Regions:
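Glycine/tyrosine- and acidic-biased, solvent-exposed loop/turn segments at the edges of beta-strands
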Residues: 1-133
Length: 133
């Protein structure tokens, strides 16, 4: 099977699970009244976790974490009702910190960035361009 989904009154309800064609779990998340609500986890084809976070009423809420395919941390991001808040931190695959962005009222208030060797550099990476699947 490739996915398992439950509907109630024509809307997604409960646990939704998807698998890669060879059986490895790809995605798992819960829905309530058709909206994403609860824990969401995605995995790469190699079995390594890709991202994990909570949705509430269809919006990202709380801490979201993501990882590179090699298992090293990619990002830690904070949300409230789908709006970016507080510090969002990003890393390169070599575990070197890439950037820290501080959000206030959903907008970048300040930022600091580094190159792959740990040297401070202008922030030309923008976290909004990185999308979850």
């Amino acid at each position: 099977k490739s996915s398992e989904i439950t509907y109630k009154n024509g809307k997604l309800e409960g646990l939704m699970t998807r698998w890669y064609e060879y059986g490895q779990k790809q995605f798992e998340g819960t829905y309530k009244d058709g909206k994403e609500d609860g824990l969401f986890i995605s995995w790469y084809e190699n079995g390594q976790k890709e991202f994990e976070g909570i949705n509430a009423g269809g919006f990202q809420d709380g801490l979201w974490k993501s990882w590179h395919t090699n298992g090293s941390k990619m990002a830690e991001e904070n949300y409230k009702d789908g709006i970016r808040i507080g510090t969002h931190t990003f890393w390169y695959e070599n575990r070197q910190k890439k950037g820290e962005y501080y959000y206030k009222d959903g907008r970048v208030f300040s930022s600091r960035c580094w190159d792959r060797n740990g040297n401070k550099t202008p922030c030309n990476f923008h976290p909004l361009k990185r999308l979850f699947k």
